[in-house]
């Protein structure tokens, strides 16, 4: 038990510095309209975060958990625009340390904290009592979990009645000529292998897991319906993935190449989810 989670933690020992160097504090896809309008990856990411905060109904004084908070960009922005208290968690202390530093730089250490949890603590989130939080958020982090359903059950438990689960995540899907599992996995298996992902879910699969956890799904949306999901990372490598000269550059070059291939095939996408705990 825990081998996959340990692998993910070890991956981010190396990937964390690379991601921060290449992407800054914001590591997820942005709002599609903002990307199309030519906004920077960071501004597009903030635009999506602001929409997710609104969907969560977070207000000043509320309490939220941001799961898989990385180096803190999304967590800090959500706290800043909502006035809510946020706790960001990951299983990698280097990430947590960088996130704490970023929160201090942005002047929000009084409302945003970051904690490192155990490799398998996502299965229960036992540090949080039943019905204690107004929202649970995540950005492209649940994809790394082998037992995604356990996380959704834990999130549902710690939400207050009326509290909301909101997030975005990497997904796989049939697209164009790639319709069978075998055809899809031709492109997705290398992504899994190079980016330390046990398996990608589907839009319907995530909806089912969230509903099985006892939440009512209000939104389950493919953010790139009918189009290839390039986001802010087009194949011309504007962020410099192939020029990265830090530790293990070949790891990130291979990951970038595999992900670009899956994007080009159309079988990779990003989904948005909003769910509420019944009162």
Please provide the spans of the model-predicted regions.
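N-terminal auxiliary segments of SAM/dcSAM-dependent transferases
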Residues: 1-18
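A short acidic, Gly/Pro-enriched loop at the edge of an enzyme's catalytic core
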Residues: 123-136
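A short glycine-rich, Lys/Arg-flanked "PGG" loop and its adjoining helix->strand segment in the class I
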Residues: 149-164
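Short, glycine-/aromatic-enriched active-site segment of Class I SAM-dependent methyltransferases
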Residues: 171-197
């Amino acid at each position: 038990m825990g081998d996959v989670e340990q692998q993910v933690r070890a991956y981010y020992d190396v990937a964390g510095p690379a991601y921060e160097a290449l992407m800054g504090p914001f590591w997820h896809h942005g709002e599609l309209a903002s990307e199309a309008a030519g906004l920077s990856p960071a501004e597009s990411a903030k635009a999506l975060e602001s929409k997710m905060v609104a969907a969560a109904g977070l207000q000043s004084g509320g309490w939220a958990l941001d799961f898989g908070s990385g180096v803190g960009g999304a967590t800090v922005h959500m706290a800043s625009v909502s006035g809510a208290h946020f706790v960001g968690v990951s299983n990698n202390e280097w990430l947590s340390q960088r996130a704490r530093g970023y929160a201090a730089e942005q002047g929000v250490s009084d409302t945003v904290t970051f904690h490192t949890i155990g490799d398998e603590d996502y299965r229960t989130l036992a540090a949080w009592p039943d019905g204690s939080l107004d929202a649970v958020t995540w950005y492209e982090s649940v994809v790394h979990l082998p037992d995604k359903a356990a996380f959704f059950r834990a999130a549902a438990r710690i939400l207050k009645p009326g509290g909301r689960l909101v997030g975005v995540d990497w997904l796989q899907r049939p697209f164009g000529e790639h319709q069978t599992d075998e055809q899809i996995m031709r492109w997705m298996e290398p992504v899994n292998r190079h980016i330390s992902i046990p398996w990608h879910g589907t839009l319907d699969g995530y909806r089912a897991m969230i509903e099985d956890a006892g939440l009512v799904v209000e939104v389950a949306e493919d953010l790139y319906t009918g189009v290839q999901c390039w986001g802010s990372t087009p194949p011309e490598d504007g962020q410099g993935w192939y020029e990265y000269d830090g530790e293990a550059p070949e790891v990130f070059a291979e990951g970038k190449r595999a992900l670009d291939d899956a994007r080009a095939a159309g079988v990779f996408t990003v989904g948005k989810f909003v769910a509420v705990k019944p009162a």
